[in-house]
């Protein structure tokens, strides 16, 4: 072994000191006895122990970590009071004079704030109230938003109290509330506070250029505070912001204390208040009184008893103006309430919706019966009567020539089409996109008040219902699926024979299918699967693109040009003379539903 330190030298002295000398010769048996179970019975404890709450430390640790993460997140958005006030605690702890010297610029305040807090609220955190709770803790509460709300409400309450004391009437009793400051009205009631008597003369002169009617009265409350009551009828409708800006400009006051609301125009008590106030010597009034005051204050034998609503008058009005839409009937008839007694009774009724539905249904029934009694010639003449005569028939002819459609064959097929001749009852316009097919057919449908069928509704049993109310119909942009449906179910309709149409909420009716226009991008006659339709349709090819100039079609197919076209070729189409219809030139005798004056036109 090489020279060096013996590894056993360090522990040799320990073994010599601590080792015990045994006289036993059998060392192996002694070691076995030492490690017997009886000897080490108390080394292992095999008894059952109570489990206890072993998860409590883990839960406590998780809760602590969660609170730290939330606090760290909030610190990104909420400044401490010292930081918001610009105090650096680290520098201030060393020396307050070092705070004036800085090599780096101050960090900008964060843009995002938690719960809408801003720098002002953070700065006012140090000055917030200390409110002691019932549990002995203290909570920091800022009273700035609450104070602003209370101050605003208190100012309005004080203004309303001043108005009531000065004029002996509540402002809310004279007015109705507009929630929006942008809602328009002709009439406005104003209550102005702290108005000096010297400005009344200038206000009297300046308001005449803006108002049709002016009435104002200046009174004083118990506290000697002045309050000016205004009733204004402007020459044009104005909103609350506009009236307030106008009064501020005329009075030369920037922060004007004013209450502005529209008056109650249907209250007899309010109308009497303004009528009586106008006769007081100290009240200034200019111009004629509004009609809502005069109508409710003039007592005569016609006003002693209000006339009841008559549905026949409303139906006659809608029939004369050709209104069949419920919303149009309700809105336009309500606008006549100022001049028509029956419309005024309609607005006073609680069954307006029922009256509108009944009126619309009756007008549709009358117009449907009127249309069915007319021939196609009478219907065309009826539709042309109310149109302008300044059209040019050459525009229609030039458009057909542009599409290279021969005019004479077109007129022959159009004559048979308008008569509803079997096998000639359907005209198909085929061509590429942007060739003017829909433009041509839609203009003709609009002229003759036809109906448009949409194949998208073909899964409904009622998609053919518009045919019952039309003299002409259109299927626009028919695809292959549409042609398959027509070939399967509508061959009779193309023939012009009677068909059964299912009506919603009514029993199916049998009608003769009106002439049908179809536009398509599918060449029907080139596909043999639709060979049974070849003899039932008249196809016109529109292969040229429709010319557009400055966003407007070169060939303008409007009602006036179509009217000129029909008037020019009336005899060519062999349409009957209106005088031969038996009405002395009129297309249909006038329908009178009640005795009285004529209906007001729109």
From Swiss-Prot:
Q: Where in the cell is it found?
A: Host nucleus
Positions annotated to bind ATP: 431-438
Per the record, the GO terms for biological process are: DNA replication
Concerning InterPro entries, the annotation shows: Helicase_SF3_DNA-vir, P-loop_NTPase, PPV_DNA_helicase_E1_C, PPV_DNA_helicase_E1_N, PPV_E1_DBD, PPV_E1_DBD_sf, Rep_E1_papillomaV, Znf_lg_T-Ag_D1_dom_sf
Transmembrane ranges?
none
User: Keywords of this protein's UniProt record, alphabetized?
Assistant: ATP-binding, DNA replication, DNA-binding, Early protein, Helicase, Host nucleus, Hydrolase, Isomerase, Isopeptide bond, Nucleotide-binding, Phosphoprotein, Ubl conjugation
**What reaction(s) does this enzyme catalyze?**
Couples ATP hydrolysis with the unwinding of duplex DNA by translocating in the 3'-5' direction; ATP + H2O = ADP + phosphate + H(+)
Region spans: DNA-binding region: 138-306
- Which residue numbers does the motif Nuclear localization signal cover? 74-76
Q: Carries keyword Phosphoprotein?
A: yes
Crosslink Glycyl lysine isopeptide (Lys-Gly) (interchain with G-Cter in SUMO): position given as: 512
As for PTM, the annotation reads: Phosphorylated. Sumoylated.
| Gene Ontology MF: a single term | DNA binding
Task: Look at the named UniProt entry and state the broad enzyme category this protein falls under.
Answer: isomerase
Record's function text: ATP-dependent DNA 3'-5' helicase required for initiation of viral DNA replication. It forms a complex with the viral E2 protein. The E1-E2 complex binds to the replication origin which contains binding sites for both proteins. During the initial step, a dimer of E1 interacts with a dimer of protein E2 leading to a complex that binds the viral origin of replication with high specificity. Then, a second dimer of E1 displaces the E2 dimer in an ATP-dependent manner to form the E1 tetramer.
- Give the protein name, as stated in the record: Replication protein E1
């Amino acid at each position: 072994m090489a020279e060096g330190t013996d590894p056993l030298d360090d522990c040799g002295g320990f073994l010599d000191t601590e080792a015990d000398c045994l006289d036993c010769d059998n060392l192996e048996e002694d070691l076995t006895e030492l490690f017997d179970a009886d000897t080490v019975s108390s080394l292992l404890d095999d008894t059952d122990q109570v489990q206890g709450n072993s998860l409590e430390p883990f839960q406590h640790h998780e809760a602590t970590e969660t609170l730290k993460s939330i606090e760290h997140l909030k610190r990104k958005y909420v400044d401490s009071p010292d930081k918001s006030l610009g105090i650096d605690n680290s520098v201030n702890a060393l020396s307050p004079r070092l705070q004036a010297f800085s090599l780096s610029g101050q960090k900008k305040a964060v843009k995002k704030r938690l719960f809408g807090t801003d720098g002002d609220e953070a700065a006012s955190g140090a000055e917030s109230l200390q409110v002691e709770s019932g549990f002995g803790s203290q909570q920091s509460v800022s009273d700035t938003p609450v104070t602003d709300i209370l101050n605003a409400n208190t100012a309005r309450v004080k203004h309303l109290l001043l108005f009531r004391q000065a004029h002996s009437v509540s402002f809310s009793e004279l007015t109705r509330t507009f929630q929006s400051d942008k809602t328009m009205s002709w009439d406005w009631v104003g209550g102005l506070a702290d108005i000096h008597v010297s400005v009344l003369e200038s206000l009297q002169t300046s308001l005449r250029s803006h108002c049709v009617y002016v009435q104002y009265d200046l009174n004083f409350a118990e506290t000697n505070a002045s309050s000016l009551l205004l009733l204004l009828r402007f020459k044009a409708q104005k909103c609350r912001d506009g009236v307030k800006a106008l009064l501020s400009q005329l009075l030369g006051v920037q922060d004007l204390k004013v209450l502005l609301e529209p008056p109650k125009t249907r209250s007899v008590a309010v109308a009497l208040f303004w009528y009586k106030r106008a006769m007081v010597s100290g009240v200034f009034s200019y111009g004629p009184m509004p009609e809502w005051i005069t109508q409710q204050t003039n007592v005569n034998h016609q006003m002693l008893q209000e006339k009841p609503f008559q549905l026949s008058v409303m139906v006659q009005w809608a029939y004369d103006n050709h209104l069949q839409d419920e919303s149009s009937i309700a809105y336009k008839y309500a606008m006549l309430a100022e001049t028509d007694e029956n419309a005024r009774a309609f607005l006073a009724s609680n069954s307006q919706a029922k009256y509108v539905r009944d009126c619309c249904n009756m007008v549709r029934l009358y117009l449907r019966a009127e249309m069915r009694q007319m021939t196609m010639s009478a219907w065309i003449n009826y539709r042309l009567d109310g149109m302008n005569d300044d059209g040019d028939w050459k525009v229609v002819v030039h458009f057909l020539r542009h599409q290279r459609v021969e005019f004479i064959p077109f007129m022959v097929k159009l004559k048979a089409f308008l008569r509803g001749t079997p096998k000639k009852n359907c005209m198909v316009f085929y061509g590429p996109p942007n060739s003017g097919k829909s433009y041509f057919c839609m203009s003709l449908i609009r002229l003759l008040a036809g109906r448009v069928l949409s194949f998208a509704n073909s899964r409904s049993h009622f998609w053919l219902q518009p045919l019952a109310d039309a003299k002409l119909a259109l299927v626009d942009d028919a695809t292959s699926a549409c042609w398959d449906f027509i070939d399967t179910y509508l061959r009779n309709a193309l023939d012009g024979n009677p068909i059964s149409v299912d009506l919603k909420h009514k029993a199916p009716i049998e009608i003769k299918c009106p002439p049908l226009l179809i536009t398509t991008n599918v060449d029907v006659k080139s596909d043999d699967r639709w060979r049974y339709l070849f003899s039932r349709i008249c196809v016109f090819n529109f292969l040229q693109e429709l010319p557009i100039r400055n966003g407007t079609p070169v060939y303008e197919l409007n009602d006036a040009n179509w009217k000129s076209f029909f008037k020019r070729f009336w005899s060519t189409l062999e349409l009957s003379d209106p005088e031969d219809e038996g009405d002395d030139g009129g297309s249909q005798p006038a329908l009178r539903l009640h005795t009285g004056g004529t209906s007001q036109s729109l």
